[in-house]
Curated annotation (Swiss-Prot):
Belongs to the transferase hexapeptide repeat family. LpxD subfamily. The gene is lpxD. The active site is at H264 (proton acceptor). Homotrimer. It comes from Bordetella avium (strain 197N). One of its GO terms (biological process) is lipid A biosynthetic process. This is UDP-3-O-acylglucosamine N-acyltransferase.
Length: 361
């Protein structure tokens, strides 16, 4: 990673730890000489320079510590002791959770580099007379804030965002460029929504209507909305449909990657993480603290209990009532071999009957 701050703004290591929200991490600095370097950025063990801090969270990279040029390295106590025994003179930040400390410090550097958007409403934005823009909020160029909408204290809307009628954006939330919130969408505090995300479009609701013709469909108006909790992150071009009657609900702390499709009436429990290209069909309920791998697909009207991990690419077609990891992906192979195996799979029911007949003979 490139140096993020110039030397005049780089904090000393102890000051960085004070600024970087180390609450609950029990960090200690171990400097053989007592000197504390200035830290201007974060890097990997292989790439960090003399004013950057690096971290070791995966033991397979421990050999890189000996050759790193980093000003300091975040390590666990046992690693620090082992490296000192080998004669290392590096400055260590000793912490039980190096990866989490790295994340906290990266958050601080990101905020320092990016800064806060200017408070106020850009002249090109269109804000309804009865919309509320709270103190410290920022409404960027070409934004539209519709009637009855509210933008919370310290929240920011990037260029081209649309906040529909009666929708709300919570305090200190950030909508990147071109995010669309339809009417009746409520986003909690400290949320991050990336470009192109659309919240509150109509769910896919249609009723067979023979009065319109054979095989015709009549639209079911989607009367619910979308509720997004606090500390949620939603990736680029992800869509969350509004509920048919009740709201589609995304719980506190949920993390959604890019290009996810969440259908109407879905409920996702707190602190669940969903990777890219997942599809969740209507009225499915996913519990708390679940992890969903990329490109997994959920049928509608399912119930997934808390603490479930779904492997990438898995089709989930029935409810899950027991915590654990579930995988339903047929492994890839050379195409010709796959064709031969596929032909066998089509005959599994017949083969099963034949085996049973042989067992009874």
């Amino acid at each position: 990673m490139p140096v993020l701050l110039d030397s005049s703004r780089a904090p000393r290591l102890d000051a960085l730890l004070s600024k970087g929200n180390t609450q609950g991490l029990e960090c200690q600095i171990d400097s053989p000489t007592g000197d504390l370097p200035l830290i201007a950025g974060i890097g990997t063990l292989a790439s960090a320079g003399a004013q950057e801090i690096a971290f070791l969270s995966n033991p397979r990279y421990q050999s890189q510590v000996a050759s790193t040029a980093a000003a300091a390295v975040i390590v666990t106590l046992d690693v620090a002791q082992a490296l000192r025994a080998q004669g290392s003179t590096l400055v260590f930040v000793v912490c039980r959770h190096p990866y989490l400390l790295y994340a906290r410090l990266a958050q601080w550097f990101d905020a320092e580099r990016r800064g806060l958007p200017p408070a106020g409403v850009h002249p090109s934005a269109v804000v309804a007379p009865d919309a509320v823009i709270e103190e410290g909020a920022s409404v960027g160029p070409q934004c539209v804030v519709d009637s009855g909408a509210r933008i919370g204290r310290g929240a920011s809307l990037g260029p081209g965002c649309i906040v529909g009628q009666g929708s709300t954006v919570g305090a200190n939330s950030r909508l990147h460029a071109r995010v669309t919130l339809y009417d009746g969408v409520h986003v909690g505090a400290r949320a991050i929504i990336h470009s192109g995300a659309v919240l509150g479009a109509d769910g896919f609701g249609f009723a067979p209507d023979p009065t319109l013709g054979k095989g015709a469909w009549g639209k079911i108006p989607q009367l619910g909305g979308v509720t997004v909790g606090n500390d949620v992150e939603i990736g680029a071009n992800t869509t969350i449909d509004r509920g048919a009657i009740e709201n589609t609900i995304i719980g506190d702390g949920v993390k959604l990657d890019n290009l996810i499709m969440i259908a109407h009436n879905v409920r996702i429990g707190a602190h669940t993480a969903v990777a890219a290209c997942v599809g969740i069909a209507g009225s499915t309920v996913i519990g708390e603290r679940c992890i969903v791998g990329g490109a997994a697909m959920f049928s509608g009207h399912l119930s997934i209990c808390d603490d479930v991990t779904i492997s990438g690419g898995t089709p989930v077609t029935s409810s899950i009532t027991k915590p654990g990891r579930y995988t339903g992906v047929y492994p890839y192979s050379e195409h010709g071999e796959w064709q031969r195996n596929a032909a066998v799979i089509q005959q599994l029911a017949l083969l099963r009957r034949r085996v049973r007949a042989l067992e009874k003979a």
